[in-house]
């Protein structure tokens, strides 16, 4: 048996040439459509990567803000400074430098409350009052006792005092 020679017949030659041209054209069509779809996918992935990057930046910004707010809240919940005010110094004719010296002396006595949290200072406010009131202060070689009139506990501890002669 012999296989017929198709390459000599022009009908078969056109058929095979058409198949080859069709295969080449369909291959180019496949490459074009595949490339188009891949280009769309790549652009979609790039958009998603950019969106994820933006979201990560937002997350980091929010985390930084949250961290700063937490630090501020921690700082706000601590006693940061002490303020002492003498209310009736004029009644005893105490000069301004002596008033300032007295206020500084009281500040030194209660300065350990700085950097303590407000809640613990509030719980020990009676002890703080007694610490101030039980001490005898010397101003111009005269002995004075202090009475706490007002004690404000916040980020700044404010103490308003009245003095009287010690007995």
Swiss-Prot record:
Coiled-coil region list: none
Membrane topology listed for this record: Single-pass membrane protein
UniProt-listed InterPro entries: YtrI
Keywords: Cell membrane, Membrane, Transmembrane, Transmembrane helix
Inducing factors: Expression requires the sigma-E factor SigE.
Disulphide bridges, residue numbers: none
Keyword Transmembrane helix: yes
Localization: Cell membrane
Annotated transmembrane regions: 15-35
Entry keyword Membrane: yes
Predominant location category: membrane
GO cellular component, one term: plasma membrane
Free-text function comment from the UniProt entry: Involved in sporulation.
Protein name: Sporulation membrane protein YtrI
Organism: Bacillus subtilis (strain 168)
